[in-house]
From Swiss-Prot:
Pathway: Lipid metabolism; fatty acid biosynthesis
Gene Ontology terms: biological process: fatty acid biosynthetic process
Protein's recorded name: Enoyl-[acyl-carrier-protein] reductase [NADH]
Molecular function GO labels: enoyl-[acyl-carrier-protein] reductase (NADH) activity; NAD binding; trans-2-enoyl-CoA reductase (NADH) activity
Record: active site: Y235
Keyword set, alphabetical order: Fatty acid biosynthesis, Fatty acid metabolism, Lipid biosynthesis, Lipid metabolism, NAD, Oxidoreductase
Chain positions of site Plays an important role in discriminating NADH against NADPH: E75
EC number in record: 1.3.1.9
Record organism: Shewanella frigidimarina (strain NCIMB 400)
Cystine residue pairs: none
Positions contributing to NAD(+) binding: 48-53, 74-75, 111-112, 139-140, 244, 273-275
NCBIfam families according to UniProt: EnoyACPredFabV, PRK13656.1
Recorded catalytic activity of this chain's protein: a 2,3-saturated acyl-[ACP] + NAD(+) = a (2E)-enoyl-[ACP] + NADH + H(+)
Length: 400
């Protein structure tokens, strides 16, 4: 079929398999160009490995450190009438390129919150790898099916205490709008913590630990975003922020357990990037368009892959073997460049000046749109989008 982008709300409902493969290849080439990570991990589990930071973590582990990787994700293959999800094609491409270089690559398509997923991963590690030395937790799911009861809990992207009103961009109409989001109820806050907090990360780590598949020096990291006062009402001070604070709680608990065997657990606070997850958060697309332009001008721009390479090479696996610098909450801060005062002041000054007419001129909004489409395999140089492509891409995947 010939596949063109179709946007609905903040998601693109179509994907291009050849474009997704090109994206993955581009990330791999970038890692290869940066060079090997001297003390990098060798056997890595990535929970939430099919897009965004999770995918970049799998690529960095495999191609930056020659690691064997197991990826866990929830994606859909193509059907008779429509292509598969971007994450399906991303993982198929990763698997192809990893195996071509003789790297161990196993993928499990499942509900990562389930007991079954954890058991399958444990069996796979015991059978093929013995133990693992790195666990990346990078789930970005709006819902969680509770593994014991089957109850489905939903998260909310809402402020706490009062209605949040701010200037935002309507990404469908490319216009500047005022958006208002009603505050979350106590139940919605609690549910958001249940879905996006640290509980499932802890469940993964205890299941792996009890099964004896964690190596003595095993590191684990989960990803977070804090941002600044520009996005705090909807993010850090909102329901989502409460979940991310629970991730901090989990990191402290896990770190004290792993410390005994020479391991560690940290939250890594990353910069804002264009991902399927961030595009769903009100105000984030406009903020990203502003901050990206300034960071590009300052030569500080990073995408997911650059961030994760820096996390691995300069924080978790330093050449000198020293412990990484952390903040007062034991977090690894990779948002340090974005939070520079001159960058943030620029955004604070610019925010009230942006209109529909000057949006493309004052910000990198056009680039934001391009990067968003690229997530789904569209708008990539060298690909003929008028050509017929086969949406049915198969690879070595365990379906649960």
């Amino acid at each position: 079929m010939i596949i063109k982008p179709k946007i609905r709300g903040f998601i693109c409902t179509t994907t291009h398999p050849v474009g997704c493969e090109a994206n993955v290849k581009e990330q791999i080439e970038l890692i290869k160009a940066k060079g090997k990570i001297a003390n990098g991990p060798k056997k890595v589990l990535v929970v939430g490995s099919s897009s965004g930071y999770g995918l970049s973590s799998r690529i960095t582990s495999a191609f930056g450190s020659d690691a064997a990787t197991i990826g866990v994700f929830f994606e859909k293959p193509s059907s008779e009438t429509k292509p598969g999800t971007a994450g399906w094609y991303n993982t198929a491409a990763f698997d192809k390129f990893a195996k071509a270089e003789g790297l161990y690559s196993k993928s499990i398509n499942c509900d990562a919150f389930s007991h079954q997923a954890k058991q399958q991963v444990i069996e796979l590690i015991k059978q093929d790898l013995g133990q693992i030395d790195m666990v990346v937790y990078s789930l970005a799911s709006p819902v969680r099916k509770m593994p014991d009861t089957g109850e489905v809990i939903r998260s909310s992207l809402k402020p706490i205490g009062q209605t949040y009103t701010a200037t935002a961009v309507d990404t469908n109409k490319n216009t500047i709008i005022d958006t208002s989001v009603e505050p979350a109820t106590e139940q919605e806050i609690a549910d958001t913590v249940t879905v996006m907090g640290g509980q499932d990360w802890e469940l993964w780590m205890s299941a792996l630990s009890e099964a004896g598949v964690l190596a003595d020096n095993c590191k684990t990291v989960a990803y977070s975003y804090i941002g600044t006062e520009l996005t705090w009402p909807i993010y850090w001070h909102g329901a989502l922020g409460k979940a991310k604070m629970d991730l901090d709680r989990a990191a402290h608990a896990l770190d004290s357990k792993l410390f005994a065997t020479g391991g560690s657990a940290n939250v890594a606070v990353l910069k804002s990037v264009v991902t399927q997850a961030s595009s769903a958060i009100p105000v984030m697309p406009l903020y990203i368009a502003m901050v990206f332009k300034k960071m590009r001008q300052e030569g500080l721009h990073e995408g997911c892959i650059e961030q994760i390479y820096r996390l691995f090479s300069e924080r978790l696996y330093r050449v000198d073997g020293q412990a990484p610098a952390v903040d007062s909450e034991n977090r690894l801060r990779l948002d340090d460049w974005e939070l520079r005062e001159e960058i943030q002041q620029h955004c604070r000054d610019l925010w009230p000046l942006v209109t529909t007419e000057n949006l493309s001129e004052l910000t990198d909004y056009n680039e934001y749109k391009e990067e968003f489409l690229k997530l789904f395999g569209f708008g990539i140089d060298g690909i003929d989008y008028e050509a017929e492509v086969d949406p049915n891409v198969t690879f070595d995947v365990i379906e649960l």
